[in-house]
Amino acid sequence: RIAFLSDHEGVGNLYSCAHDGSDLRRHTDHAEFYARHAAGDGTRIVYQCAGELWLVDDLSPGAVPHRLDVHLCGPRAGRRTYQVPAAQHVDGVCVDETGRASAVVVRGSLHWLTHRDGPARTLTDTPGVRVRLPEMLGESGQVAYVTDAEGEDAVEIAHLPRASGARPPRRLAAGRLGRVLEMVADPAGERLALASHDGRLLLVRVGETEGQESQEEQAGQEGQEGQEEQEGQAGQSVACDVTELIRSVNGPVRDLAFSPDGAWLTWSHPGIGRSLRQIRMARIAGPDTGPVLDVTDGRFEDENPVFTRDGRYLAFLSWRGFDPVYDVHTGDLSFPLGCRPYLVTLSSATPSPFALNPEGRPAAGGLDPVGYEDEAGDGTVTVEVEGLASRVTPFPVTASKYSALHPVAGGGLVWLRWPISGALGETFANPDDLSGRPTLEHFNVGRAQKSELVGDLDWFAVSGDGTRLVVMDEGDLRAVPATEAGDGDSTVWIDLRRILHQVDPAAEWRQSFDEAGRIIRAHFWDPGMCGIDWDAILAQYRPLVERVASPDEFADLLREVLGELGTSHAYVAAARRNEGPPHYQRPQGLLGADLVCREGQWVVRRILPGDSSDSRARSPLAGSGIREGAVLTHVDGRAVDPLTGPYPLLAGAGGTTVELTFAPAGESGGGAARRVAVVPLVDDRPLRYQHWVARRREVVRELSGGKCGYLHIPDMGGSGWAQFNRDLRGEVFRPALIVDVRGNAGGHISELVVEKLTRTILGWDVTRDAQPVSYASDAPRGPVVALADEATASDGDMITAAFKLLGLGPVVGQRTWGGVVGMTGRHRLGDGTVITVPMNAAWFAAYGWSVENRGVDPDLEALRTPLDWAEGRHAQLDDAVHLALTLLAERPAAAPPAHTDIPDRTRPKLPPRNGQD
């Protein structure tokens, strides 16, 4: 009998059947948790269920599984506390008013760290509680942050360390905020603005009442004696005002920013679709509070609005550049350079700093004669609503990709500028080049001058007064000036080793389990959870957290929990502890060739030809003069072992230079040996993939007599788009076309592929010395047949459905994977585990919701059996080509016109005048 696990009856259990598939039996009856990881010895089957081992003695109808009680004598070392290096676990930084110190979040704990010397001080570090999004409250000596100490997000206000003693933190609005995505404080530290997952923009007043102040003063007077006991304790919940300013119906608002006087709040508001956003603002303080104002109209993607520190301007980033760039291969046009910062003068009485000046611009390095800095505002914001949108002006900088816009001292701005690079990372000559990282730039608004502050960084934070920046660069934290490039004297390197954080794995896993549950509940595509009692599911699995003893086990548990969603794209990636120095590890070296052992010699049987259009698909032996049949004898002067071969000698050699010694074919020690220097590949999959595609194209050519073109699309991302366009022009001109999406890993560009394949030939462009070209160009000339299988997934499901719904052509193969509830982004839990949430569900007029968990059925079912595979037969390709040729016979391919019936363009003879012969 054949034993296997299946959940076809709703829950995973152990089954068996006869070799022909008959006599199906169920051997276990687990109704709550899945039976998993079955293994057998030919008679007995062992498996795990809910963290316990179970054994089935045989596959007879009456066999009853029984639990194995395994007692471990040693401690579960994976649950012991351990220390982590802070530099590898920084989750957020908030700089104080002057840039002297920062509040640093390290793996869910919050620490106060002076930049130059001084000790680190723990503000809050409670095992099982995660702290996020710290914000300084002006110069009040307090810091706000988001905590989940009560099981839902709340705001907590903590006092910075001081000599008079510790004061307990205050907790506000627990359970009233949803999942907080962003939080900013006004300059005075009296209010917080929060963006929630459900589209709400909330205002929270954080000022203390008289009773609260007296209680905290009393706590502070207890002195240093009780200080250590109070550190890390839970905050006291107090009442507060939470005001909903606005609610978005198209997803969360983001990029919140207060004006320098604290009277105005601006943000980026989502529009219909996935890219349109508009800048909005509202007066939230003073006697003239009024309705929300639209700064921009939502036609473009506008984001990251900020007020300049003088209060005269609003700046934002906008993707509204429409200077098309021609595609060098297909002639298509795209907009890769669409982003630029823009400036809005808030009052018509304020001149644009970019307008022409009758006095001209100052000489380089000189002072502006109009005295911009002297006339700058005091931070009070005056908004003239009439004509606001018409006062939007682009910055005089090159269009590129920008992010992280912030105001700094002197009325200037800083931002990150990103290089334009390819989706596959092949833009830069050296794969290890860091030039794909952003550059931090400063713009002096008064002088309209741009300067570079820091090159190649990760992210940065700004001090409260805008004079200093804290820059994160691959684990190194440093403070630099905000308005000019730093030097040795002005740059302060911040020693993160002063932060000592002990991780309690058991407490972290409990917190991360609950946090994962909240994230799923907040972001799952259906608010009703498709009928699932999510709280009951979490309660069912929560006791199993106490059995977890490693990050991998915790990730495995979360996979079971997310599996209860019955939905695709619910992934879990395990955390890594990263304690201690990183292990020295280099990738295996690969030669891009197949070697076989013949009579104790390692012979080059085949050098993969590769593809010159793919820089990753080239064998190191190509062009070296080594031919198939040569014998590899030495690697870096070390003899190749006849038994283990060259691979142990190439361990760790990937990406570095090695010397290979070859003997001519048939020679073991004599003959003229040849030494070559090569750089082994770290990954030969692109090379083998291109060879795989070339072989199948040859099969299609042979089966069709050259009448069928062949395209394979490995995924619906950057590599799939590249592969599709790599061969489209050469294959689409043939009478029929096979589009192979077997094994397609999904992505998001199926619409682009469909646009190409749905082009119709309406006519021909005829020229004198070349073959006619179809209009539309690169359109299929005849029938198109799709190939799909059970590994055609996600956006591969989508394009297979599109083939059928649009009538592009029949689908041959197997039913597709069936996963069309996509994800957007990834969520990192407190312990470092990463999860994804199914957020975007696909619905089709013809299928409804049924493609999810079902897939798309082919028009012609074809299966490549293991025997076909072993004997080199291509059953699915055979059927696809046969069907394409049948359709071609019924509907011949479009052909250019014959060179006949050419119009006569000779000038007609002038007729006689009227009344004359």
Mark where each language-model region is.
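A short beta-strand motif characteristic of beta-propeller blades
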Residues: 23-28, 80-82, 121-124, 168-173, ...
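Short coil/turn segments that connect the beta-strands within blades of beta-propeller domains
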Residues: 42-43, 98-100, 139-141, 188-190, ...
